[in-house]
Amino acid sequence: MSAGGALQTAIAAALGNVPDLTGVFDGPPARAAYPYAALDATTESDWGHKSSDGREVLVAITVWDDQPVRLHALADQVEANLQALPATEGWQLVTMRLVRRRVLRDVAGPWAAAIDFRARMLAV
């Protein structure tokens, strides 16, 4: 399994522990009740060295909700749940760092918390 695929599986499992989320999806769902999270961990670049393969994976998590106060609390819970990720198949998670977090809203749509992380992983 690719580093991004393994990481996405681990993140989905961790976000499943956030009780107020109605679902965690690999990309935007066609229909879902708020609040929910969509995640993407498919952008990978080389982070290897002489004796081991490695990957840097960019992780984008978007939490959608129609209530901004609850959205901020959910974004905090998402960050907290990613501090102790479960083991990833075939990869060792070396670092998982927050890159950026912002809250956005389309005039005609719901609120979104876009949370971006950078993960560095080594093959085991």
Label the predicted regions.
Residues M1-G23, A41-V124:
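Charged, amphipathic alpha-helical segments and their flanking helix caps
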Residues P28-A32, V107:
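A short beta-turn/loop motif at secondary-structure boundaries
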Residues A32-A33, A87:
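Short loop/helix-cap segments at secondary-structure boundaries that form the rim of catalytic
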Residues A33-T43:
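A short, hydrophobic beta-strand-centered structural micro-motif
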